[in-house]
Amino acid sequence: MIEAKTDPMIVSMGPHHPSMHGVLRLIVTLDGENVLDCEPVVGYLHRGMEKIAENRTIVQYLPYVTRWDYLATMFTEAITVNAPERLANIEVPRRASYLRVIMLELSRIASHLLWLGPFMADLGAQTPFFYILREREMIYDLFEAATGMRMMHNYFRVGGVAADVPYGWIDKCLDFCEYFLPKVDEYEALITRNPIFLKRVKGVGTISPQQAINWGLSGPMLRASGVSWDLRKVDRYECYEDFHWSVESEETGDCLARYLVRIREMRTSTKIVQQALKSIPGGPTENLEARQLSQGRTSPWNEFDYQFLGKKASPTFKMPRQEHYVRVEAPKGELGVFLIGDDHVFPWRWKIRPPGFINVQILPNLVQGMKLADIMTILGSIDIIMGEVDR
């Protein structure tokens, strides 16, 4: 029997393909339907976010950061204010910390919802997409009532939040939580045991725990591989230790495990929001003192180098000559900022550690030997946003 030998075919997927989740290009080498190699090409959405940060004060830079991961903007704002707060040792009032946690967890739910809808659409299931957008709109209505904006919120400030939530907002948010928990059960009833869905995701794109650690993966990608690592438990930032919740993880490390982790995280986030709303303390929502110089009150000379501000944190807030790495558990993984201050209003160095950029690097490893159709499944399960990958 004579075997016909064919040359490998090179296919360029993207950068404008709808299932690329942004301007990502994949150069795929195929032997028939089988993937021999895959090379991601990133950088189409690079805007120089790190260099912009080094030429702006923190207050000026805050509106820019919502353009990294534009579907989970609360987290990019949180990391931007947390870095100078830790560097200058600025305390955040308890009420502001609770409000931050509520906003962060609502943002996590919205991000996971907008991951689930397109992921199912990539697999050919269009129906869940419309249900998911219905709930996401409700979260955006809550954001609009509290911050004035549906997406680019610009709500976090150095030392607190921009404003307290309006009258009746807490009750409305509690009503949403009561409404949303049964909806997650509805998604699971629609999706989880569907035989077509299971054939597309079970055993596809498997990552072992050791692989996940070696590649530096974080977030649901890491927890789906059996590594129970969540920065909300590890670093205990904001006031997460005040609430009762557990880290969601799976053992199999495939696309199904990543789906299950995110579905359960939506439930966990809703329960954290409920606890925070029921036990939110009174008091100010912003720390109205900012340290102008690194000495603070302990200066042996006088009190002039410690500045009390009547209103907002000053745009001339100086960052001490120190360096610090700050991280938060974003919906896609560990979002970090390495900040070097220089006794100046501008940061000397502002290095962003985006989870999407780290997580997408394992993609060529996962798709080798798989079918062409599995690329969409695996890429969708990673959950990337190109604004954050390219910065």
Curated annotation (Swiss-Prot):
Keywords: Chloroplast, Membrane, NAD, NADP, Plastid, Plastoquinone, Quinone, Thylakoid, Translocase, Transport. The keyword DNA-binding does not apply. GO terms for cellular component: chloroplast thylakoid membrane. It is found in: Plastid, Chloroplast thylakoid membrane. GO terms for molecular function: NAD binding; oxidoreductase activity, acting on NAD(P)H, quinone or similar compound as acceptor; quinone binding. It is an enzyme of class 7 (translocase). It holds the Pfam family Complex1_49kDa. GO terms for biological process: photosynthesis, light reaction. Its EC number is 7.1.1.-. InterPro entries: NADH_Q_OxRdtase_suD, NADH_UbQ_OxRdtase_49kDa_CS, NDH1_su_D/H, NiFe-Hase_large. The keyword Ion transport does not apply. It catalyses: a plastoquinone + NADH + (n+1) H(+)(in) = a plastoquinol + NAD(+) + n H(+)(out); a plastoquinone + NADPH + (n+1) H(+)(in) = a plastoquinol + NADP(+) + n H(+)(out). It is a peripheral membrane protein. HAMAP family: NDH1_NuoD. NDH shuttles electrons from NAD(P)H:plastoquinone, via FMN and iron-sulfur (Fe-S) centers, to quinones in the photosynthetic chain and possibly in a chloroplast respiratory chain. The immediate electron acceptor for the enzyme in this species is believed to be plastoquinone. Couples the redox reaction to proton translocation, and thus conserves the redox energy in a proton gradient. NDH is composed of at least 16 different subunits, 5 of which are encoded in the nucleus. Belongs to the complex I 49 kDa subunit family. This is NAD(P)H-quinone oxidoreductase subunit H, chloroplastic. It comes from Nephroselmis olivacea. The gene is ndhH.
